[in-house]
């Protein structure tokens, strides 16, 4: 009897204790759900470079110095309420992970306005007189007197941590034109001198100097169907057939002629004073809406620096630069992934081809390999994600349209489409069915010609929280676009219209974040 009574009392006690625990846990669970629902969505890209806060736009050409890549970019600490840019500094050993070094050239420290785009070089032979291996930057600033665009020299003797204003500024006064900016400086090994290209409205000016201080005009290049040019670029590359070619590039506006508003380039010859293009019509490094202010730079670790180069750009567009939910996370400014460039010869034409740098592969945390799929209609994959690289070989016999829907919602109403419109003869990226920055809906489908008679294509697609970059085939055609899907939209669907499409070698590499 005593044992039975004790057992009953124990049962009652445990039941009462369980009720108390349930009452205590239920409100906590409800509170956790409410707290979770109030958390801000994370719109910071996982593996793309982003400004720590506020605003960034134009990249400056990175340099390799003292075992690291040094990257400067335009930064506005007062955004969105105040104007004016300055140069912020970051360093990297692998071009994937970056360490912020803070502001290197602050704005408004002299009467000549804020700091705009320019370029920085390592003065290995002390041609400017600031010391061997001094970093010398030439940047555009609006003059104190009449706000005209002029070129000013700053120099650093502490490995780019800070820069001093040269007392002899400006080194290039305005010659009497409205547009006179974005100087890009390179060393010409053939003639042992510095060469500069300058954006001058619809013209690219060429200049030379022995000491980075005294500059002389040598010639001008007038692009066709490129509109106003900015951020010019000049470099030599060795093509796939062994030919050395000079490449002249610039951010350009081809929209009035149905062309991109990204990075235009011309291959040709350069004699140290004048550039002559192989053909007058520009080629384009990117067909998306958001690859602007692009810069290229040397692979300084390579034994053959002419074989390949690197490139990156600001992923935004001046037509809608401030339309971004990333401000919920306190910033507006994302770069493209760094890509590897090679110069390919085909049928007598030389073209740049791009692929993401291999160093991105180190971010892979898991890989999904999906069996080959024949699709007539649509097929949703079981895997999901918002930070990954997807590769597939797409082929067909007869069809109108085929591709991949990315960042798809559960009800399949929201998505981004990447594919080949065989009936129209072009590749495309369409962001109309997801959140995206262009509120006018003018820039929703980016497209580029594609030879559909091949009846096959390899697609390499980089997906991040706010970006999508598509490398078509060998990478001669690339699309870079901003997108702002809801964080929960992570589906992937294969589709075809008007016939059967075959998707083979489907691989999805899920990437880790570069942020701590």
UniProtKB/Swiss-Prot annotation:
Enzyme class at the top of the EC tree: hydrolase
Record: active site: 58
Extracellular side: 27-516
Compartments where found: Cell membrane
Organism whose genome encodes this protein: Bacillus subtilis (strain 168)
Sequence positions that bind substrate: 55-58, 116-117, 181-182, 230, 318
Higher taxonomy: Bacteria, Bacillati, Bacillota, Bacilli, Bacillales
Substrates-to-products reaction catalysed: Hydrolysis of (2->6)-beta-D-fructofuranan, to remove successive disaccharide residues as levanbiose, i.e. 6-(beta-D-fructofuranosyl)-D-fructose, from the end of the chain
Family that this chain belongs to: Belongs to the glycosyl hydrolase 32 family.
Annotated transmembrane regions: 6-26
Record-linked Pfam families: Glyco_hydro_32C, Glyco_hydro_32N
A GO CC annotation given for this chain: cytoplasm
Protein name (Swiss-Prot/TrEMBL): Levanbiose-producing levanase
Physiological role: Catalyzes the degradation of levan mainly into levanbiose (difructose). Is not active on sucrose.
Annotated InterPro entries: ConA-like_dom_sf (IPR013320), Glyco_hydro_32 (IPR001362), Glyco_hydro_32_C (IPR013189), Glyco_hydro_32_N (IPR013148), Glyco_hydro_beta-prop_sf (IPR023296)
An example Gene Ontology molecular-function term: sucrose alpha-glucosidase activity
Alphabetical UniProt keywords: Carbohydrate metabolism, Cell membrane, Glycosidase, Hydrolase, Membrane, Transmembrane, Transmembrane helix
Cytoplasmic side: 1-5
GO biological processes: sucrose catabolic process
Record's bilayer topology term: Single-pass membrane protein
Induction data: Induced by sucrose.
EC code(s) of this entry: 3.2.1.64
């Amino acid at each position: 009897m005593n044992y039975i009574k004790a057992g009953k009392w124990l049962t009652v006690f445990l039941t009462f204790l369980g009720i108390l625990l349930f009452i205590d846990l239920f409100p906590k669970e409800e509170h956790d759900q409410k707290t979770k629902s109030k958390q801000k969505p994370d719109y910071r890209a996982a593996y793309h470079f982003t400004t720590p806060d506020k605003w960034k736009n134009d990249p400056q050409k990175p340099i390799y110095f003292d075992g690291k890549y040094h990257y400067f970019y335009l930064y506005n600490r007062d955004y969105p309420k105040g104007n004016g840019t300055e140069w912020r500094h970051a360093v990297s050993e692998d071009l994937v992970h970056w360490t912020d070094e803070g502001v290197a050239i602050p704005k408004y420290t002299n009467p000549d306005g804020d700091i705009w785009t320019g370029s920085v070089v390592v003065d290995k032979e002390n041609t400017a007189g600031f010391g061997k291996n001094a970093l010398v930057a030439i940047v555009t600033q609006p003059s104190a007197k009449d706000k005209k665009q002029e070129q000013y020299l700053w120099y650093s003797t502490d490995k780019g941590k800070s820069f001093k204003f040269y007392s002899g500024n400006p080194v290039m006064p305005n010659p009497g034109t409205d547009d006179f900016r974005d100087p890009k400086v390179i060393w010409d090994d053939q003639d042992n001198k510095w060469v500069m290209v300058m954006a001058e409205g619809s013209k690219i000016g060429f200049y030379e100097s022995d000491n980075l201080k005294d500059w002389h005009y040598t010639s001008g290049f007038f692009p066709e169907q490129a509109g106003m040019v900015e951020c010019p670029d000049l470099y030599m590359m060795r093509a796939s057939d062994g030919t050395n070619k000079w490449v002249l590039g610039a951010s350009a506006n081809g929209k009035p002629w149905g062309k991109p508003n990204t990075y235009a380039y011309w291959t040709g010859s350069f004699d140290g004073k004048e550039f002559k293009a192989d053909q007058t019509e520009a080629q384009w490094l990117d067909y998306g809406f958001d690859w602007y202010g692009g810069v290229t730079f040397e692979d300084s670790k390579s034994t053959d620096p002419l074989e390949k180069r690197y490139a990156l750009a600001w992923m935004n567009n001046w037509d809608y630069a401030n339309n971004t939910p990333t401000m919920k996370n306190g910033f507006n400014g994302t770069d493209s992934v760094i890509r590897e460039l090679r110069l390919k010869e085909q049928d007598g034409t030389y073209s740049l081809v791009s692929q993401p740098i291999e160093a991105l592969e180190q971010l892979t945390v898991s890989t999904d390999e999906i069996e080959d799929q024949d699709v007539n209609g649509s097929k949703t994959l079981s895997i999901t994600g918002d930070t990954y690289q997807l590769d597939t070989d797409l082929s067909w016999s007869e069809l109108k349209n085929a591709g991949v829907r990315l960042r798809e919602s559960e009800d399949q109403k929201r998505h981004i489409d990447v594919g080949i419109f065989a009936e129209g003869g072009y590749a495309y990226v369409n962001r109309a069915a997801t959140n995206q920055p262009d509120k006018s809906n003018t820039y929703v489908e980016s497209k580029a010609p594609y030879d559909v008679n091949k009846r096959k294509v390899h697609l390499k697609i980089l997906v991040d929280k706010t970006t999508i970059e598509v490398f078509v085939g060998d990478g001669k055609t690339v699309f870079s676009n901003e997108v702002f899907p809801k964080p929960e939209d992570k589906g992937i669907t294969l589709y075809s219209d008007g016939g059967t499409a075959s998707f083979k070698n489907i691989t999805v590499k899920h990437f880790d974040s570069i942020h701590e």
